[in-house]
């Protein structure tokens, strides 16, 4: 079996995600998380080529969005890139992150609010209701 290096694997996944965003299948898509900013930034030149090819934009995510949708270790203290087309959708993502921070700061981050934020994040990622529910049910590593 042929071995694929990590850089090529992650770049190939990003290519697929950019194509899905361009086609309207996904509103936003996440690249594979990286352990360091330097690792994430090593993809920039290639990601820029993908963005040009697929007419999408990229946003460097330096503070992973932790919700019950994914295991904490997937995004905590990791660096990522978000691919998107519509600036309003990126703003919706940023607003959702801020809403979570405010809820935590004011003591209103209840189980219902946690679920609501995770659900809305899943919708931004264009997941089906069934897919969101499955991810929530399967996640055994919540904050």
Features from the language model and the residues they span:
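An amphipathic, hydrophobic-aromatic interaction surface with interspersed Lys/Arg
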Residues: 115-122
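A conserved ligand/cofactor-binding region detector
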Residues: 1-102, 106-109, 120, 129-138
């Amino acid at each position: 079996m042929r071995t694929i290096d990590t850089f090529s694997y992650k770049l190939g996944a990003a290519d697929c995600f950019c194509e899905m965003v361009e086609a309207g299948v996904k509103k936003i898509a996440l690249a594979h998380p990286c352990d360091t900013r330097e690792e994430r930034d090593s993809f920039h030149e290639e990601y820029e080529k993908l963005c040009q090819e697929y007419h999408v934009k990229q946003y460097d995510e330096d503070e992973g969005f932790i919700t019950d949708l994914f295991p904490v270790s997937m995004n905590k203290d990791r660096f990522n890139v978000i691919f998107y087309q519509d600036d309003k959708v990126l703003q919706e993502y940023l607003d959702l992150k801020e809403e979570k921070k405010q809820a935590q700061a004011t003591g209103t981050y209840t189980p219902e609010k946690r679920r609501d934020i995770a659900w809305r994040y899943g919708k931004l990622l264009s997941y089906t209701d069934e897919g969101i529910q499955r991810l929530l049910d399967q996640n055994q590593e919540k904050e």
